[in-house]
Structure formats: structure tokens, C-alpha cells
Design a protein with these regions (language model features):
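Alpha-helix initiation/capping motif
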Residues: 2, 62, 169-172, 302-305, ...
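Terminal targeting segments of Actinobacterial cell-envelope proteins
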Residues: 1-24
Length: 381
């Protein structure tokens, strides 16, 4: 098998022959130890215990290394739960890759006897941001600049929450046409009980800071495989300081959304969530309070390396008459880039197509940063 083929996550030589379920594994290990003892090899068995632990995502993550999805906690009450890995590593010739850890368990509920099933995944993608503007905005803005995301610690360019994150890699990993390479991580999953009850149940990453550690570990392995790693590996050493606020119901059409003066929406059946509010990043999400459908996504990005993911898609003309900088207002997304307090700032909008929403947000963010309004007077609503 070539290194570009999809391959299972690496295992220890003898461990790879063991079942992936806990009960089957323990039974076979016990039988092997007894057999070895009976043949005079008990000392060898004792000297080499414990068996090598499974590793996942190009060797970045080790079984039982902290977060629940890598330990027995992932299986709940199921003694036969399984955890499997598959991966394709990036290379110098093909600097894209992916890895996935999948967890499955089925057991009978001790409370009501219903059959319970969980299927969970943690997926990592390594590669450049898309060329097309809409695809790039959908990936980065919709996926990783929501109101529940916060900046990565230690000045790392990216965002994170308890279900995943995005990290922009150093310029040495850029494509020949200048697009940054990013590593993304997402946890997903479902929980089913009985014949009719199903809910979202993402794999447990251990919180936002642990998710940042997992993301950076995968990024370091990916960069090494692709031949673009920096001299020193990226590290997470600080806590997360900028935690997002809780979602809050919007009770009136006159209420300011996400604490932004003058940003009013035309419906009351929504809730807003404010994420980071720093000089480098500001995020806001508005969703339906019953169905969670996105109603409005807003972000300001001034961190240079994170903002680089939008290079080349901000256009050459103002977004509209009287607006500063350059940008476009499309059917699904809007983007504006303008100088603000001595450096470029990028203002983004998703879900809504109303330029007044972006105007209110951009002008409020610009005022907070100490620079001139982005949109002309009267454009906000």
C-alpha cells in the first residue's frame, strides 16, 4: 500500500490482532497471558505489559490520553463498544489529508430496557482553503467563525470550541497560488434510544482547551508529513481566556442583537450568542430559538494570519456606494475589508442577505477598534 492510500490508524504488532471491543480484548489478553505462563513465557509477558496503545490521526492522539472519546468512557454501558481509526496522511506531493476516529456502541438501557445506540466521529481535515469565494466563506465563516467559537490561545491563528476548531498553518505551508493551508477538526454523532428518539450527541473532546490541544497535535503531525513544519512545533500552553456567552433569547424587535447598538432584526423567535470580542476577532450568531436554524452570522477578523484565509476574495471595488474598503455582498455571504486602526480588518456576514445588518455590525466593531465607520450613515438597520 502506498503512503497516499487510505490506511487504518497504526497499531502495535501484537495489539493489532486483538478485538477492538473492551470485553473481547480483555478476554483474549487473559487467555494469552495464561497460555504464555503455561509455556514458560510468563516472564516475557510481564516484562512487556502493558500492550502498546492505539494511536490515531497520523500518530497525534493516543488511546486513554485524556479526552473521553479516546478512553473507555466513550462506550457508556457497552462492554463491547468499538473505536476505529482511518486516515490518509498529507505528503509533499499531495498536501491534503484526513483522519477520522469513529466510536460505536449498542446496549440495553438499565433504566427502561430500551436499546441504546451511539455513533460518534471526530474528523480532521488538512488542506488549503477552497479557491471559490462562496465555498471558502461557507467553510470558514459558517463553520468556524460562529458566536460559539473563541480564539485559539497563545496567539495561534484560529478558533476553537468544545466540538472542534480551525487552525491556519504557517506561510511555509501555503499553496503555490498563495492560499493558506488549514487544519480543521469537528466532532459529531447521534444518540438513539428506543424506536423513535434520536438526538445529536457529538464525541466528547474534553472541552475547548483540550480541543485546542488535539487540533494543534494533529496539525504538527500533518505539517511534518507534508514537509512544511516550522523549526519548533506549535504548542498550546495557556488557558482560554475569551469564552463565549450563553445563547440569549431576543424578546423584542427593538432589542440590540449581540449587544451591538442599532442591530435590530424583524423577528422575536430568535436567540443570539456573542463569541469573542477582542481586537483580533469578534463573532456573533443569531439562530431560531426552537429549531436552531441560522438567521445571521457576523464576524470581524483582524488577526493577520487568520484574515489571510480571505485574501483574494474581497474584490477590487467597494461593497456598495459609500462603503470604505473593498468587498462584495452576495446571495449567501458578504465580505468587506478595510483599513482599521493601522491594519486591515475583514468584516463578514452569513445567512442574512440584508446589508444593513453588516453595516451595523461593521460600524460598531470599527468604533470599538478606534477607526472610521465602514458603512455610510444611514446604511445600518
Amino acid at each position: 500500500m502506498s503512503e497516499t492510500d487510505e490506511a487504518p490508524a497504526s497499531r502495535g504488532r501484537l495489539r493489532g490482532a486483538l478485538p477492538s471491543s473492551r470485553r473481547g480484548r480483555l478476554s483474549l489478553i487473559s487467555a494469552l497471558v495464561l497460555a504464555l505462563a503455561g509455556t514458560g513465557l510468563g516472564t516475557w509477558a510481564a516484562d512487556t505489559w502493558p500492550w502498546p496503545k492505539d494511536r490515531y490521526c497520523w500518530g497525534a492522539w493516543e488511546e486513554d490520553s485524556g479526552p473521553d472519546f479516546l478512553g473507555d468512557e466513550a462506550f457508556g454501558d457497552d462492554d463491547d463498544g468499538s473505536r476505529t481509526g482511518k486516515e490518509t496522511a498529507p505528503t509533499r506531493e499531495r498536501p491534503t489529508g484526513s483522519c477520522e476516529v469513529a466510536i460505536a456502541s449498542d446496549y440495553k438501557s438499565r433504566y427502561d430496557g430500551d436499546k441504546v445506540s451511539t455513533d460518534q466521529q471526530v474528523t480532521v481535515e488538512y488542506g488549503p482553503v477552497p479557491k471559490a469565494a462562496e465555498a471558502r466563506l461557507a467553510m470558514v465563516l459558517d463553520g468556524f467563525l460562529r458566536g460559539d467559537m473563541v480564539p485559539l490561545p497563545d496567539g495561534l491563528p484560529g478558533t476553537v470550541n468544545g466540538r472542534g476548531g480551525l487552525l491556519v498553518l504557517p506561510k511555509s505551508c501555503d499553496t503555490q497560488d498563495g492560499r493558506p493551508t488549514v487544519v480543521t477538526m469537528e466532532a459529531s454523532g447521534t444518540y438513539t434510544s428506543g424506536p423513535s428518539y434520536t438526538q445529536n450527541d457529538p464525541a466528547d473532546l474534553g472541552g475547548a482547551r483540550q480541543a485546542a490541544v488535539l487540533l494543534v497535535a494533529a496539525a504538527n503531525r500533518g505539517m511534518a508529513a507534508a514537509g512544511c513544519a516550522p523549526d519548533e512545533p506549535l504548542r498550546v500552553s495557556s488557558p482560554l481566556y475569551d469564552l463565549p456567552g450563553e445563547p440569549e433569547a431576543v424578546f423584542s424587535t427593538s432589542d440590540d442583537v449581540c449587544g451591538i447598538r442599532g442591530l435590530h432584526l424583524d423577528t422575536e423567535d430568535i436567540e443570539d450568542q456573542t463569541g469573542a470580542v477582542t481586537r483580533d476577532l469578534q463573532t456573533c450568531s443569531v439562530r431560531g430559538d426552537h429549531d436552531g436554524v441560522p438567521y445571521l452570522e457576523l464576524a470581524m477578523v483582524a488577526q493577520p494570519r487568520l484574515a489571510a484565509v480571505f485574501d483574494g476574495i474581497t474584490g477590487e471595488q467597494p461593497a456598495a456606494r459609500g462603503w470604505r474598503g473593498t468587498g462584495t455582498i452576495g446571495e449567501k455571504h458578504a465580505i468587506v475589508r478595510a483599513d482599521c486602526a493601522g491594519r486591515p480588518a475583514t468584516f463578514l456576514m452569513g445567512a442574512s442577505t440584508d446589508p444593513g445588518h453588516l453595516a451595523a455590525f461593521a460600524n460598531a466593531a470599527a468604533a470599538r477598534l478606534g477607526c472610521a465607520p465602514i458603512a455610510p450613515k444611514g446604511a445600518a438597520r
